[in-house]
């Protein structure tokens, strides 16, 4: 009865990143709940750079455990790591993004394509006249991740599927980091709506506010403090919430069901996408 189950948790460092902090909070919540069943978590963190990721990969591959919870950020390195890890024949759950075609692995998280498709609908909603849409990519190298690209793909697909929406014209801007000094007024000349396919919508919002540009519809992701600030001010219109805490919790829950209860569990668990507007954002009260 007193068997211990060791789960390796392999994630990016989270100190100042709310999204990953929330993932960890969900994982911790599950850890506490399931500790009485002998579940022990061993954490492996990597910094947001490839060399740190590779260092941690070595440790994770050497570590003996019953299952792995993994958030793949660097696409190619993660694919390589997975194919190496598969030789261990232990269950693997991915959270945040799904990079594997292997049906044996589980995935808990958003359907990235679908979330981009949803953003397309939100942009087109209740709009009749000619619209200029800007897809604003604020990306560090790591975000050539599949999630990012799938969201953009989903976004364009919405308009492909709705050919009657002839009044939308698209342009793209890419900046390399989140410095507001990279933005200029010309980027937004004539623009009616902006889609930011990651959690940095607040950078666009801050720029528009500073330059007193009003009436631009902004859609982004994730309930970061800064995003919420501009949502409440009415500068950001919609945020798509991926419920990171639930992802972390469900990832551990999946392994608990599979290994401890030995239940058959579905390998894909999509977290429902939440559309957050100023009017329906009620922060969770810390009890």
Task: Label every PLM stretch briefly.
Residues 77-114, 224-232:
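Flexible loop/hinge segments that line or gate small-molecule binding clefts
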Residues 12-21, 42-52, 109-115, 136-154, ...:
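Hinge/beta->alpha junction and helix N-cap segments in small-molecule ligand-binding domains
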Residues 1-17:
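N-terminal helix-turn-helix/winged-helix DNA-binding helices
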Residues 140-144, 159, 243-287:
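Hinge/cleft segment of the Venus flytrap/periplasmic-binding protein
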Residues 8, 132-136, 192:
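Conserved beta-strand elements of the Class I
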Residues 67-86, 171-226:
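Hydrophobic alpha-helical
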Residues 28-40:
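Signal peptide-proximal N-terminal region
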Residues 107-133, 181, 243-260:
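Hydrophobic alpha-helical segments within soluble ligand-binding/sensing domains
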């Amino acid at each position: 009865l007193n068997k211990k189950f060791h789960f390796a948790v392999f994630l990016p460092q989270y100190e100042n990143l709310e999204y990953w902090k929330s993932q960890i909070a969900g994982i911790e919540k599950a850890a506490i709940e399931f500790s009485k069943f002998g579940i022990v978590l061993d954490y492996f963190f990597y910094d947001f750079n490839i060399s740190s990721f590779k260092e941690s990969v070595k440790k994770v591959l050497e570590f003996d455990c019953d299952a792995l919870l993994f958030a793949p950020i660097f696409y190619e390195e993660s694919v390589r790591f997975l194919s190496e890890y598969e030789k261990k024949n232990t269950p693997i759950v991915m959270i945040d993004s799904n990079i594997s075609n292997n049906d044996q692995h589980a995935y808990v998280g958003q359907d990235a394509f679908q979330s981009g498709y949803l953003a397309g609908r939100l942009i087109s909603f209740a709009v009749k006249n000619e619209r200029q849409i800007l897809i604003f990519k604020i990306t560090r190298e790591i975000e050539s991740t599949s999630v990012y690209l799938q969201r953009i793909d989903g976004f364009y697909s919405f308009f492909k599927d709705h050919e009657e929406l002839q009044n939308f014209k698209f342009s793209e801007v890419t900046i390399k980091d989140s410095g507001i000094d990279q933005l200029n007024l010309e980027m937004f000349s004539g623009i009616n709506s902006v889609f930011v396919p990651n959690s940095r919508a607040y950078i666009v919002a801050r720029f528009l506010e500073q330059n007193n540009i009003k009436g631009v519809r902004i859609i982004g992701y994730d309930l970061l403090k800064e995003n919420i600030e501009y949502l409440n001010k009415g500068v950001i219109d919609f945020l798509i919430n991926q419920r990171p805490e639930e992802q972390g919790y469900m990832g551990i829950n999946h392994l608990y069901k599979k290994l401890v209860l030995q239940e058959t569990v579905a390998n894909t668990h999509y977290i429902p996408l939440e559309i957050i507007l100023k009017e329906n954002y009620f922060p969770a009260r810390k009890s």
